[in-house]
Amino acid sequence: VCLEILPDGIAWFCGNHSAADQSGFLACPPAKRAPLLADLVAQQGWTGAPTTVVLPLDQYSVFQLERPDGLSDHDLADALRWKLKDLLDYSPSNAVCDVFDFPHDASRGRGHLVNVVSARKTLAKELVALVSDAGLELKRVDVAELALRNFAAQMDTSGRGMALVHLRDGYGQMVICKGPVLYLSRRLDVSAEDLRDAGRQESAVQSLALEMQRSLDYFESQLGQVPPRSVRLVARDTKLPLASMISNYVAAGIETVDWGAQGLTEPLDSRCLVAWSAALPVAEAPSR
C-alpha cells in the first residue's frame, strides 16, 4: 500500500500497476483522516499490509551539501542534520533527515555532494501514528520527487533523460532524471484555477512554460547535462489542451502520458500519481 497524505485528502494505491481502479483519492480534512483511513483499510482488507507513506513537496526540504569524509552511510544523515541550522526555519533537533546521492557528473567541481532531506519530527510522528492506528505496517517514508523519479525512470527507456511535470490544483512539480538518477526537482508556481480561467489562462501558461524552460536550461548550463527532448505532462484537467498550449514556449516537445503504454486501461487520477509512482520498481543507480 502506498499513501500520500495531503491537506485535502489521502491518495492511495495498492496493486500491481495494471489497472487504474487500484488507486483512489479519499477527500477529507486533516481532522477526519484517522477514522476515514481506518475505514478504508477495513474496506480494502489492508490490515497489516506493508505501507509506504509519501511526503508531498510542501512538507519537506532538500539541500545539497558536501559529504564529509570518513562517515558511513548509517551516520551521514545525523551528521549533516546539524549543518542545516542556518537553512531551516526550525531547530535541527526537531528535524528528521535522510540522504540520497547527488549525481556525481552534475557536481561541476563542487566535491562529493549528497541531497539531504529534512522534515519536521512532529510531522513524521503524526504520520507514523496515523498509519499504525489505521492497522497498517509502516515500511518506509518516501518523498514526492523520488516517487516521481520512479515513473520518469520507467519512461526513460533510452537512458538519455526524461522530464516529468505533475500539475496539482495549487502548484506543479517538475523532475528531470536520467534512468534511475534524479538530477533536478522544481516546484512550479501555477494553479489549476489560473490555467482554466479565460482571463488569466494565457499569462498562467506563459509563466508555467517559463519555469519549465528555466529548469531545462539549468539542467544544461549548471548541471552540464544534455536536456531531454521531451517533457511528459500529467494534469487533472484532461480536457484542457495544455501540452499544445505550453509547447509554443518550450524548446522540448510536450506530451501527455500514454497510460495505455503504462499498462492501464483508463487514465490514472492525477491526484494519485505520486502514490502510484511510489510503488513502481526502480533500477539501482549505477555505482561510481
Residue ranges and their predicted role:
Residues 1-288:
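Hydrophobic/aromatic-enriched cytosolic interaction surfaces used to assemble or bind macromolecules
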